[in-house]
Structures are given as structure tokens and as C-alpha cells.
């Protein structure tokens, strides 16, 4: 689908992410609570529900640099994706109000594979890894790291 995401697993229950392209490009989130489990050698499953009502389930296969994601978007996000393009942490009550106003259905399911293009160890709980929207990053990101 041409979307480009960046995910930082901060610890065993929390992640930060930012979206570089796609219908919600420049959306970014910190301290998203998630279920993170190892399911095989270098294979992890990460799942969460956002304040928007969006459900996300990811499989990260570091050995094969393969990523599979299933995102369940409520209808209101598909109808007005621009409402979610923000630093979500500053707008959680607003996201909840959008979710409650709906509509939730029909749910849009995005189920796709992707290639993992960049991996690095940034340590645990490093708030500097994802600290701005994608459009504020250097042009040569992530090569500049």
C-alpha cells in the first residue's frame, strides 16, 4: 500500500511509532500499551487497541526481515483519516470522542506484508528514538543514524 512505518519497542509492554507515508502520514504516538510476545526464534507478535478504536496486530520476523500487519480501522478513520494525523498523546480525549461518535462499522481490514528495512538497538525506554513527526526528520533518515 506504500505506507512506511517506524516502530520502537520501548520495553515489554510499550511501543512508540510514527507513520511516514500513507493516509495517516505524520501521525505519531508514544507510550502505546501493547501485548508483546515472542512466538519463535526472532519472531514476535505485537497487538494493541488505540484510543481511536483501531486495532492492530503485527508479526515481526527479524530473522527474515519480514513484517505482517493486520489493522482494523473503524469506519470513521477511513472516512476522515486526517483527524488522526497528529501527536496522538496530546489529543487522546479528542480521539476518544471521535471513536464514540463513530461510525465504527463497517470495519476496514488492512492485511499486508512488508519488508523490514532498518533495525537497531536503542535500549529500553529511550524517549529520544521517536520524538517528532516524520516530516520533521532529516531528508536522509534513517541513513543519518
List PLM regions with ranges.
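Short beta-strand segments that buttress and anchor functional surface loops
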Residues: 1, 17-21, 46-50
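Tryptophan-anchored aromatic micro-motifs
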Residues: 1-4, 145
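Hydrophobic residues embedded in beta-strands of well-ordered beta-sheets
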Residues: 13-16, 43-44, 65-67
Amino acid at each position: 500500500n506504500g505506507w512506511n512505518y517506524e516502530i520502537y519497542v520501548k520495553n515489554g509492554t510499550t511501543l512508540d511509532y510514527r507513520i511516514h507515508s500513507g493516509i495517516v502520514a505524520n501521525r505519531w504516538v508514544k507510550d502505546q500499551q501493547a501485548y508483546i510476545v515472542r512466538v519463535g526464534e526472532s519472531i514476535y507478535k505485537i497487538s494493541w487497541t488505540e484510543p481511536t478504536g483501531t486495532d492492530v496486530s503485527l508479526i515481526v520476523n527479524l530473522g527474515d526481515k519480514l513484517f505482517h500487519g493486520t489493522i482494523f480501522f473503524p469506519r470513521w478513520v477511513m472516512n476522515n483519516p486526517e483527524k488522526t494525523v497528529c501527536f496522538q498523546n496530546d489529543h487522546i480525549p479528542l480521539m476518544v470522542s471521535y471513536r464514540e461518535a463513530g461510525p465504527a462499522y463497517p470495519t476496514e481490514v488492512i492485511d499486508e506484508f512488508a519488508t523490514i528495512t532498518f533495525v537497531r538497538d536503542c535500549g529500553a525506554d529511550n524517549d529520544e528514538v521517536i520524538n517528532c513527526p516524520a516530516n520533521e526528520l532529516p531528508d536522509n533518515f534513517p541513513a543519518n543514524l
